[in-house]
Amino acid sequence: MDLYISNYTSDDDMAILRRRWIELLPLVVGDIVHVENPEGYSYLLDPIIPGPGYVVTWYHQLHCLFFLMSEYDRLLRHGPNGKERSIPAGSSSIHTRHCFEILRHSILCHLDMTLEGGSAPFFNGTTGFGHAHVCQNRQEAIDWMEKNRANDNRMIIRA
């Protein structure tokens, strides 16, 4: 877990985490993939970019989770000493609110029915760790995204 979670100590730590999170992503421009004949899919809205390019939801969710962790890290490290008014480029409450909503939708859409029990002695409730979950085949999803990528960039948050 510590490989992907901030220890709230420095910008250098967050830069290392950003690189690790980027390695979780397929080789695509963030979340954009090319869809042939989108008019053949009645549920698709207009593409986000011409080509036509569409956003893949699981990437968007991972992006939002990283963004929220980054904002929380910034708040913990800079908030108490008055630097909370000094917001770095890329930070925004609108983006943060959007990411909370994306993750809410994800939770309600996937409705993971894993039964969690057995909490850690220091935790009042369940930690959620150590339980068997049924997941999608990650490699199949990555292969499809890389095959249909718009270009060869990788990013977790646009810098």
Curated annotation (Swiss-Prot):
Sequence motif: HXXHC 2, positions: 95-99
Family: Belongs to the ustYa family.
Notes concerning its domains: The 2 HXXHC motifs are conserved in ustYa family proteins and might form active sites.
GO biological process: mycotoxin biosynthetic process
Domain of life: Eukaryota
Gene: VicYa
Role this protein plays: UstYa family oxidase, part of the gene cluster that mediates the biosynthesis of the secondary metabolite victorin, the molecular basis for Victoria blight of oats. The role of vicYa within the pathway has still to be determined. The pathway starts with the processing of the precursor vicA1 by several endopeptidases including kexin proteases as well as the cluster-specific S28 family peptidases vicPa and vicPb to produce 7 identical copies of the hexapeptide Gly-Leu-Lys-Leu-Ala-Phe.
Metabolic or biological pathway, per its Swiss-Prot or TrEMBL entry: Mycotoxin biosynthesis
InterPro entries for the chain: UstYa-like
Pfam families for the chain: UstYa (PF11807)
Protein name: UstYa family oxidase VicYa
